[in-house]
Curated annotation (Swiss-Prot):
Entry protein name: Phosphoheptose isomerase
A Pfam cross-reference name: SIS_2
Coiled coil: none
Provenance organism: Wolinella succinogenes (strain ATCC 29543 / DSM 1740 / CCUG 13145 / JCM 31913 / LMG 7466 / NCTC 11488 / FDC 602W) (Vibrio succinogenes)
Listed pathway(s): Carbohydrate biosynthesis; D-glycero-D-manno-heptose 7-phosphate biosynthesis; D-glycero-alpha-D-manno-heptose 7-phosphate and D-glycero-beta-D-manno-heptose 7-phosphate from sedoheptulose 7-phosphate: step 1/1
Domain SIS as annotated: residue spans: 34-189
Misc. remarks from the entry: The reaction produces a racemic mixture of D-glycero-alpha-D-manno-heptose 7-phosphate and D-glycero-beta-D-manno-heptose 7-phosphate.
Functional summary from the UniProt entry: Catalyzes the isomerization of sedoheptulose 7-phosphate in D-glycero-D-manno-heptose 7-phosphate.
Length: 189
């Protein structure tokens, strides 16, 4: 059992080191996009499936509540939380449209979308990003593996350099915390 624990922790450390080498400048760019969005009176919409849905909710909560610093709430909405909307849209239009229909209803030009998918290929995330691009939203991705189709649809896609879903998810929430810190410091300064 100790070997497994050691191996998992080492894999986490290696993924963290690779992520730091490859993505640090892009994380700063994403933070700037988020700050620009918020300072111009727009909002951030986040979405994903499973663990990525939980990450979307977590990030939205850090922004609307607070991360570390006492400040005004920032407009961020997780499109994963309204069970009535999710089930109605899923029933009437299919599960692939559960996020794109909400983007159509809630997003405006200048808003920022954050699509989260460890593969970069979740159909409902891709359709939401496509809808966001049509509207004129800034599109950001948190993905893994090679980034999938999200590479084409995102202004910036933060692709975690791993094929292991748990490692990708760990880096997503780490980068999310870094982004929340940077936004909190700069969006209300």
């Amino acid at each position: 059992m100790q070997d497994f624990i050691q191996k998992e922790l080492e894999a986490h450390i290696l993924t963290t080191q690779e992520t730091m080498k490859r993505l640090a400048p892009l994380v700063e760019e994403v933070a700037s996009l988020m700050v620009d969005c918020l300072k111009s009176g727009h909002k951030i919409l986040l979405f994903g499936n499973g663990g990525s849905a939980a990450d979307a909710q977590h990030i939205a909560a850090e922004l609307t509540g607070r991360y570390k610093k006492e400040r005004r709430g920032l407009p961020a909405i997780a499109l994963t939380t309204d069970t009535s909307a999710l089930t109605a849209i899923g029933n009437d239009y299919g599960y692939d449209r559960v996020f794109s229909r909400q983007v159509e209803a809630l997003a405006h030009k200048g808003d920022l979308l954050v699509g989260i998918s460890t593969s970069g290929n979740s159909p409902n995330v891709l359709l939401a990003l496509e809808e966001g691009r049509r509207i004129g939203c800034v599109c950001v991705g948190l993905s893994g593996r090679e980034g999938g189709r999200m590479n084409e649809l995102c202004d910036i896609n933060l692709v975690i350099p791993s094929h292991d879903t748990p490692r990708i998810q760990e880096m997503h929430i780490t980068l999310a915390h870094i982004l929340c810190h940077l936004v909190e410091e700069r969006a209300i300064a």
